Amino acid sequence: ENPDCKITSVSQNDNQNYCKCEKCAAVDEEEGSHAGSLLRFVNRVADEIKDDYPDVSIDTLAYQYTRKAPLITKPRDNVIIRLCSIECCFAHGLNDPDCEVNAAFKHDIIEWGKISKRLYIWDYVTDFTYYIPPFPNWRVLRENLEFFADNHAAGMYPEGNYNSVSGEFGELRAYLLARAMWDPYMSDDEMNSY
């Protein structure tokens, strides 16, 4: 129906209702993560389509209960892992040694980066709890972009203003993030020129 589609998603639902049958539970126990059963399924789909659709990739979320990388199964070359940072603290950088909330995600991105050739990040770039007031986390966003690049992230989706006219300077934040994604290591002077 859409021959130009190059990425299609096979992902979990946006909830905590994962399969608890005996077989899936055994796989997840062996893998040390609920991502084990999901990734084995996604890999089978990827294997089925690779000959007929060699330019198409399967995208799947590493999100909430599947965020932790599996111990055994690795994503196929035509599988994209989209690691979501929803549980993180967005006022502190992922490398901040004083932020215990971000420590688990930091570990997860490092582990996914070791096994995935195509790691993308779904990052949350504003404060959804207090959406409209100023949330000056630009320094954190810049640090995190560098951290993502250092840990083999090949793409990023920054979710910010999605449900109202705008949060704090939403359009400017989106523009600056777009510029920074082209070069996550650009200097502050370069960034300030935009």
Regions inferred by a protein language model and the residue ranges of each:
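Carbohydrate-binding surfaces of carbohydrate-active enzymes
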Residues: 184, 189-193
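Catalytic-core regions of glycoside hydrolase
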Residues: 1-185
